[in-house]
């Protein structure tokens, strides 16, 4: 895999703290879920009255979402007395009968939720909305969302790219109806249309029609649950179709759960070193894919408990290899792969072919960078095969991918001399990561 766009990487190397064989232990409070934060923000912008989102994630992805919604006419106001990870937010929704507006531009950055969730909202806007983002975002697939909008009668201009940049010419309304898309590349294609459907003129029936299922299905269930909690008639019709009935959405007053996917690197620190790490405020029931940590980490030999909202992981003396289907929680794969590279036995990660279309081609990136540290990793049709081998230090490139950066940090706990290029890319979903990591594991590289 080539390292395009990484000419600056050698100038920004972060020495990953090395633990010299000592266990990592501590308690880590994790900021709010990115997936929930951005869903709540979108729904609040579509509501009929102001909303309050408590303990939202403040990161590049959520800031891009806030800016996009403000561009379309919502007002987002930080409230006083911020907590440890930033202020609560008041959202005044987009006016429904706004007059035609001058052309506007939305910067998606590298945020999948922005580039996919906001175009259907732009169709409800009156006027021209241009979308673009980072260079790396221009290779992320957008076809199913744009195709779905066209089926609904929305005028979309993309010069046949099915990717950024593109233009949506909104008329202020979308009729609704039945839409069929190929959602095998991302569950976000489904969530994008379901969220906006609360403001369509008639019900939306959305069908996935392609070989194979929809990856990361818990994220679709998360979208449905967020809609239902707001009083919307939203449901799964069958394994491949969903239905949303439009209607007024009351103002939200919600508290965002901690981001359980972002809890992963801190839990992995305990697993990799035989320590004990606790995450407070872990929900008993959740639609977050990160809740799979409760089932994944014991496969490596770790002990896990969830008592009174505190999830605690104690690592084993020796990491076992694993054989895991991660189709429902692909965002956990970089952290899991880092642990597999430290395990004493072979591992196989399956069901994650769709990661080739994430912030980077994560399968190619993981195999390239792990092998660059002496690993024995092979890409398979739908995942990775990882053999045990002795690793050595070196530069771990991140490809502007936040989860690649945290994977490199995990490896550095056990492998001296690992240098992570562009640790600042963690600002995408966890700006505080370098500080939080140093507080938990120490700062010695």
Curated annotation (Swiss-Prot):
Residues that, per the record, bind 3-phosphoshikimate: 34-35, 39, 186-188, 216, 331, 358
Catalytic activity: 3-phosphoshikimate + phosphoenolpyruvate = 5-O-(1-carboxyvinyl)-3-phosphoshikimate + phosphate
Enzyme class (EC, first level): transferase
Biological pathway: Metabolic intermediate biosynthesis; chorismate biosynthesis; chorismate from D-erythrose 4-phosphate and phosphoenolpyruvate: step 6/7
InterPro entries xrefs: Enolpyruvate_Tfrase_dom (IPR001986), Enolpyruvate_Tfrase_sf (IPR036968), EPSP_synthase (IPR006264), EPSP_synthase_CS (IPR023193), RNA3'P_cycl/enolpyr_Trfase_a/b (IPR013792)
Quaternary data: Monomer.
Function according to Swiss-Prot or TrEMBL: Catalyzes the transfer of the enolpyruvyl moiety of phosphoenolpyruvate (PEP) to the 5-hydroxyl of shikimate-3-phosphate (S3P) to produce enolpyruvyl shikimate-3-phosphate and inorganic phosphate.
Cellular compartments per GO CC: cytoplasm
Protein name, entry field: 3-phosphoshikimate 1-carboxyvinyltransferase
UniProt key word Lipid metabolism: no
Active site: 331
List of residues binding phosphoenolpyruvate: 34, 112, 140, 188, 362, 403, 428
Principal localisation: cytoplasm
UniProt-listed NCBIfam families: aroA
PANTHER family (UniProt xref): AROM/DEHYDROQUINATE SYNTHASE, PENTAFUNCTIONAL AROM POLYPEPTIDE
Enzyme Commission number(s) of this protein: 2.5.1.19
Keywords per UniProt: Amino-acid biosynthesis, Aromatic amino acid biosynthesis, Cytoplasm, Transferase
Pfam families reported in the protein's UniProt record: EPSP_synthase
Localization terms from the record: Cytoplasm
Taxonomic superkingdom: Bacteria
GO-annotated biological processes: amino acid biosynthetic process; aromatic amino acid family biosynthetic process; chorismate biosynthetic process
CDD domains: EPSP_synthase (cd01556)
